[in-house]
């Protein structure tokens, strides 16, 4: 679980600090910085575990100028995260300018590791690292083995943290038809930000899906079963099977399946099958009918996953407790963060005056 995030000089965040709980709904007018918060998590994950080499974490935005505050390339971007991993506290800091990582600090339980410039220090040991690589680039997991490129050994507990940090944090901008698009059979068993990879996850976990109550119940309620199909060119396609009253099977291709159903299925699999500890979603309400939104609120409240979600939907806001709302606004190009002060008093006031939380936020 992520408890705190501090952002300096990333996009519209000059010097901003978030405190997170179990459910966090981020609201604000267009252009206030909601998507920039999602981008911050996306950028950080790409920074510490690049998808390609040499690493270039700015590729989505073009270059460093387009991600640094006020496009001032003299400024360093930095992040600080406090959270909990397997019941133990951690603290992580990173600062960079362009492709040069200047500092990293990692504290996990009683262990500490520090990187200044290209030198990593742990206890009385040290080694050098290229300027453009995070310390976390040195750790990777293969089936049945964990490997790392250090010239000294680490305790198993710290090694586990270093290998898995942020791997169980999902950042999503789910595009339903991309989520269920065919993938090559060697595609990783993982979901990208658009949900792509869902077909591979389903293919590799069909039996587990039938044993995962929340996912199985959702499929049964919608009279749908899932059937992966391997094609001659090495791709995997997903067919959705619907049964008629006379038990005849109707094969539905993804284009014939509602986007809201696919989005809910993706979220359910991320929460209950992949067991992601934190799920970050931009515009969580998109494509979802009221029935699905109500179900999603229950998932946010009662699952083991933490949720950080942006929304424009009054309906989602009105399902929330005032303490779960994070309010953004922008002043002279800088995002400002506010939370409801004295949420219990506000709840009493809203109830007494017959005002919805979304109405209070709007007016």
Spans of features found by a protein language model:
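Electropositive, glycine-dotted interaction segments
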Residues: 88-224
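N-terminal pre-Walker A segment at the start of P-loop NTPase domains
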Residues: 1-13
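Phosphate-binding glycine-rich loops of NTP-binding sites
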Residues: 20-62, 264-265, 270, 310
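Conserved ABC ATPase signature
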Residues: 227-291, 295
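Catalytic acidic motif of RecA-like/P-loop NTPases
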Residues: 11, 24, 42, 258, ...
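Glycine-centered tight beta-turn/hairpin loop motif at sheet-sheet or coil-to-beta transitions
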Residues: 13, 84-89, 221-223, 233, ...
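C-terminal lobe/lid and adjacent interdomain/linker elements of RecA-like ASCE P-loop ATPase modules
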Residues: 220, 294-363
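Conserved P-loop NTP-binding catalytic core
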Residues: 38-101
């Amino acid at each position: 679980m992520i408890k705190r995030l501090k952002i300096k000089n990333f996009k519209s965040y000059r010097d901003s600090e978030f405190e997170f709980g179990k459910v966090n709904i981020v609201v604000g007018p267009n252009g206030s910085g909601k998507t920039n918060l999602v981008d911050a998590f996306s950028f950080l994950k790409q920074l510490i575990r690049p998808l390609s080499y040499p690493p270039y974490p700015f590729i989505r935005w073009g270059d460093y100028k387009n991600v640094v505050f006020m496009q001032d390339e003299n400024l360093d971007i930095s992040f600080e995260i406090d959270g909990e991993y397997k019941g133990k506290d951690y603290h992580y800091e990173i600062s960079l300018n362009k492709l040069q990582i200047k500092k990293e600090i990692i504290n996990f339980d009683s262990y500490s590791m520090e990187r200044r410039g290209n030198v990593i220090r742990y206890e009385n040991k040290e080694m050098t690292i290229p300027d453009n690589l995070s310390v976390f680039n040195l750790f990777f997991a293969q089936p049945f083995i964990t490997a790392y490129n250090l010239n000294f050994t680490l305790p198993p507990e710290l090694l586990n943290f270093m290998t898995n940090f942020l791997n169980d944090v999902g950042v999503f901008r789910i595009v339903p038809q991309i989520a269920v698009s065919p993938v090559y059979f060697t595609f990783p068993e993982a979901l990208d930000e658009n949900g792509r990879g869902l077909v591979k996850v389903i293919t590799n976990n069909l039996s587990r899906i039938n044993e995962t109550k929340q996912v199985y119940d959702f499929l049964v309620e919608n009279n749908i079963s899932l059937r992966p199909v391997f094609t001659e060119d090495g791709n995997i396609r997903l067919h959705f099977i619907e049964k008629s009253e006379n038990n005849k099977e109707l094969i539905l291709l993804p284009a014939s399946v509602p986007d809201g159903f696919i989005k809910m299925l993706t979220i359910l699999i991320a929460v209950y099958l992949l067991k992601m500890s934190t799920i970050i979603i931009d515009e969580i309400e998109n494509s979802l009918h009221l029935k699905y939104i109500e179900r999603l609120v229950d998932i946010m409240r009662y699952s083991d996953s933490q949720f950080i979600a942006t929304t424009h939907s009054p309906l989602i806001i009105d399902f929330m407790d005032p303490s779960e709302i994070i309010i953004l606004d922008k002043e002279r190009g800088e995002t400002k963060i506010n939370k409801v002060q004295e949420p219990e008093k506000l709840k009493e006031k809203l109830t007494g005056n017959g005002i919805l939380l979304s109405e209070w936020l709007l007016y």
